[in-house]
Amino acid sequence: MTNNYQKPNPDDRSDNVEKLQDMVQNTIENIEEAKESMEFATDEEKQRIQEKNARRNESIESFRSEIQDESAARENGYQS
């Protein structure tokens, strides 16, 4: 019988800050595009877009908090 256990990848956090910054930028772009699309949206669609953009803003705040955590961890050598 073959052993199907896969060894987990090592924890590589070296580029987490950059990935999170990209995620913030992409989310901001999505918000801007959504705002532009509201020009052609029905009232119901506008409401959904506004709600989604509110959730996107919450995500951005979470990303920024995580960026701070990751930056601090990077400065401290990723020690637990």
UniProtKB/Swiss-Prot annotation:
Keywords: Sporulation. It is found in: Spore core. Residues 34-73 have a biased composition (Basic and acidic residues). Residues 34-80 are annotated as: Disordered. It comes from the Bacteria. The keyword Lyase does not apply. InterPro entries: SASP_thioredoxin-like. Coiled coil: none annotated. GO terms for biological process: asexual sporulation; sporulation resulting in formation of a cellular spore. The keyword Magnesium does not apply. Induction: Expressed only in the forespore compartment of sporulating cells. Belongs to the Tlp family. This is Small, acid-soluble spore protein Tlp. The gene is tlp.
